[in-house]
Amino acid sequence: MRIGGLDVGEKTIGVALSDELGLTAQALEVIRRRSLEQDLARLDEIARHYGVVRWVVGMPRNMNGTYGPRAELTRAFMERLAGHSGLPVEAWDERLSTMAAERVLLEADVSRARRRKVIDKMAAAVILQGYLDARAARPPESFV
């Protein structure tokens, strides 16, 4: 059982996966967005190949906790993903996820060109790891 994490942007979707135990998140790939149908088809392929049972999608929020226009687009994407895949889809606060991913890549001395290629999947891993950590800290019945 794996959980998939997504960082949904206008041009790309960063994808991360949990390990089988649902303890750690690893960056998987960056999907270059072409059309909603192609995006959903690729996510279906990933779900089938890796045994994804749930998607966690980063929900953009302002620093004051409010939702902006990007959040509405993300909600619409989540609804389409849930309807298309038949899997549960949860929103998770993505505030500062890209900044955290950037910091990790800078500390690892990754070049600017390489950072640009991997930042979205790293942000997805940060989002998913936050979800997994919160899940581990709560009683199992709260995640039914």
From Swiss-Prot:
SUPFAM superfamilies: Ribonuclease H-like. This is Putative pre-16S rRNA nuclease. It is an enzyme of class 3 (hydrolase). The keyword Hydrolase applies. Its main location: cytoplasm. It is found in: Cytoplasm. The keyword Nuclease applies. It holds the Pfam family RuvX. It comes from Symbiobacterium thermophilum (strain DSM 24528 / JCM 14929 / IAM 14863 / T). One of its GO terms (biological process) is rRNA 5'-end processing. InterPro entries: RNaseH-like_sf, YqgF, YqgF/RNaseH-like_dom, YqgF/RNaseH-like_dom_sf. CDD domains: YqgF. GO terms for cellular component: cytosol. Keywords: Cytoplasm, Hydrolase, Nuclease, Ribosome biogenesis. Belongs to the YqgF nuclease family. GO terms for molecular function: nuclease activity. It comes from the Bacteria. HAMAP family: Nuclease_YqgF. Could be a nuclease involved in processing of the 5'-end of pre-16S rRNA. Its EC number is 3.1.-.-.
